[in-house]
């Protein structure tokens, strides 16, 4: 068990041909935040282990392992392709706060890119750092000016060729205004696009 003491590298990755992975590309590992809905999560693990490695973040590894090996919700699961990692969590929604896979050169030099999460959930916001530590992959974080960027995975889709799709929420949550729990980063739309480009190789947003 390790404790994440800092966020990732807060400067752009040192590559000139960055490529953000597409939503539909083959994956090496599926990440799950074990927080509520245990029966559904167990079924996701069972359906995924024949396709890829499954990494389960949980606050109580022994309890999670016992549940995965138990008879409920489909029966015992073979854990040979499952990593159970102890990590503090706030919520289940790892799609929104998890890391983004980016390559420095097409399919090589893999890194992870992590944005500021758009919710007041500090444990969730550092899960990407825990993933990078577990896999031995560098994490680049948009958490420090002038590259501080707030975003959520549910508002992002990439095609793997330099184009990404976002709603205007990314503008609203980076306009420098205040909300009940934080003050947003302050960027123009052009500055937002520049951050996506230098961290993820996105040239069309």
Residue ranges and their predicted role:
Residues 2-205:
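The feature marks the mature, well-folded catalytic cores of soluble enzymes
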């Amino acid at each position: 068990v390790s404790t994440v003491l800092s966020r990732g590298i807060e400067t752009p990755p040192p590559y000139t041909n960055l490529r953000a992975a597409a939503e539909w590309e083959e994956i090496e590992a599926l990440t799950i935040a074990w927080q509520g809905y245990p029966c559904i999560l167990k079924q996701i693990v069972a359906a995924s282990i024949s396709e890829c490695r499954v990494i389960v973040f949980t606050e109580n590894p022994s309890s999670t392992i016992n549940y995965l090996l138990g008879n409920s919700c489909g029966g015992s699961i073979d854990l040979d392709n499952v990593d159970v990692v102890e990590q503090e969590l706030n919520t289940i929604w790892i799609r929104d706060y998890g890391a983004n896979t980016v390559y420095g050169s097409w399919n090589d030099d893999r890194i992870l890119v992590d944005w500021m999460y758009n919710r007041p959930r500090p444990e969730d916001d550092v899960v990407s750092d825990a993933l990078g530590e577990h896999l031995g992959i560098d994490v680049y974080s948009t958490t420090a000016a002038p590259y501080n960027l707030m975003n959520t995975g549910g508002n992002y889709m990439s095609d793997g060729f330099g184009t990404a799709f976002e709603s205007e929420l990314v503008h609203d949550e980076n306009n420098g205004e205040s909300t009940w729990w934080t003050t947003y980063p302050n960027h123009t739309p052009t500055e937002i696009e520049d951050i996506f480009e230098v961290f993820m190789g996105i040239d069309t947003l």
